[in-house]
From Swiss-Prot:
Post-translational modification: Highly phosphorylated.
Record has RNA-binding as a keyword: no
Protein name, UniProt field: Protein E7
GO molecular function: DNA binding; DNA-binding transcription factor activity; protein domain specific binding; zinc ion binding
Sequence segments annotated as region (E7 terminal domain): 1-42
Major place of residence: host cell
UniProt motif LXCXE motif: location: 22-26
UniProt keyword list: Activator, DNA-binding, Early protein, G1/S host cell cycle checkpoint dysregulation by virus, Host cytoplasm, Host nucleus, Host-virus interaction, Inhibition of host innate immune response by virus, Inhibition of host interferon signaling pathway by virus, Interferon antiviral system evasion, Metal-binding, Modulation of host cell cycle by virus, Oncogene, Transcription, Transcription regulation, Viral immunoevasion, Zinc, Zinc-finger
Motif Nuclear export signal: where in chain: 78-86
A Gene Ontology cellular-component term: host cell nucleus
Length: 99
């Protein structure tokens, strides 16, 4: 295209769709002898989720002192804990737990 405005001559109007073969011809080897050691799949067939350390700062339900928790969890389980903390689950400090 040349100039400031596009003209009909600048476009290719005679394009035809191309057909594509969607079959996969890949040959896979027999993997029944191999043991899966990468830890991706559990025995129940679910993929293993990555875990990380998470730091939680909250308050004691009884005395309002600051509590710091460190958990090692998956992101999904962390969200579950978050929903529980926002709901009815209350955490107490060791001092209040002894009372």
């Amino acid at each position: 295209m040349r100039g400031d405005k596009a003209t009909i001559k600048d476009y290719i109007l005679d394009l035809q769709p191309e057909t594509t073969d969607l079959h996969c011809y890949e040959q896979l080897g027999d993997s029944s002898d191999e043991e899966d050691t990468d830890g991706v799949d559990r025995p129940d067939g679910q993929a293993e989720q990555a875990t990380s350390n998470y730091y939680i700062v909250t308050y004691c339900h009884s005395c309002d002192s600051t509590l710091r928790l460190c958990i090692h969890s998956t992101a999904t389980d962390l969200r579950t804990l978050q929903q529980m903390l926002l709901g009815t689950l209350q955490v107490v400090c060791p001092g209040c737990a002894r009372l």
